[in-house]
Amino acid sequence: MIRHGQTEFNRVFSATRRDPGIRDPDLTDYGRRQARAVACALRPLGLAKLISSPYTRALETAEIIADQLGLPITVERSVAERFCFTCDIGSPLAELRARWPSVGFDHLDDPWWPKIEETEEVIWRRSQIFRQRICTEAWLETAVVTHWGFIRALTGLTVPNGTVLRIDPTRPDREPELIFSGDHG
């Protein structure tokens, strides 16, 4: 599980604890550096699949990782952030297709993000459905670019931007392993 790199929303919200009103933000320069560092940390793992949330910050992180590791990106709505801030208003599919023409978005509704705030129960259920599904796949060879809320729902942990955790979806009782911490300068 990879938390996307830093965005301007993250930077401002961390400093003020107020929603700065930025919709579907891009990564900052620091966030792009975090994504490149994550790619380096992932290289020895021999990944075969890269899943990303459809939010721009996750796709941009995934694109940097995919370019460095030679992986295709698969978009999944199920690993998106809990919808509760302005940054969780996504981009229309036409914009996503124009920016990432090699990524498939045809399976998503437009708009693909919720219309109302999601409860913690909703994102927890979504994370558990994802956990059950990924158990049937080659999960050791799969990386998922996702968000603070989804990682928290799945693991109970809060992690900084650019952090990589290894989870065993078949063992929800097992603590995730920290592969890389994005919490450095």
What do the predicted segments below correspond to?
Residues 82-102, 138, 152-185:
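Acidic, low-complexity terminal tails and accessory targeting/binding regions
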Residues 4, 147:
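Histidine-centered divalent metal-coordination motifs
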Residues 123-137:
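A short, acidic, amphipathic alpha-helical segment used as a generic capping/interface helix at domain edges
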Residues 52-53, 125, 145-146:
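Short beta-strand scaffold positions
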Residues 46-48, 138-142:
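Short coil/turn segments at beta-strand junctions that form active-site/ligand-binding loops
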